[in-house]
């Protein structure tokens, strides 16, 4: 499992390097928080801001897994995925995208996140 904290470490390294070289922060550096790891025997992904008082929260439980997706003003705000983590990289790249047309379908593990983002992100790592 190669992405445990690599994405956040790489982002922090880019930001630190630019700060040391007095270079401005680039817009692509403003990407949502992403952490994926293992707690005991459970793989998880924490993406963006899945917790908050505003917006709609969609929950899914099944096959021993849990998925929570939060949408604020029609745009994807964050997700918490336990065991059933299909689409985690695509969800990370879809943060801020308008997902209002999909309703509660976006919380299901079989939701076509790769179609929404236009690339097959699940096979990059």
PLM features: residue spans?
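C-terminal auxiliary extensions adjacent to catalytic cores
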Residues: 60-125
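Mid-to-C-terminal Rossmann-like scaffold of FAD/NAD(P)H-dependent oxidoreductases
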Residues: 1-89
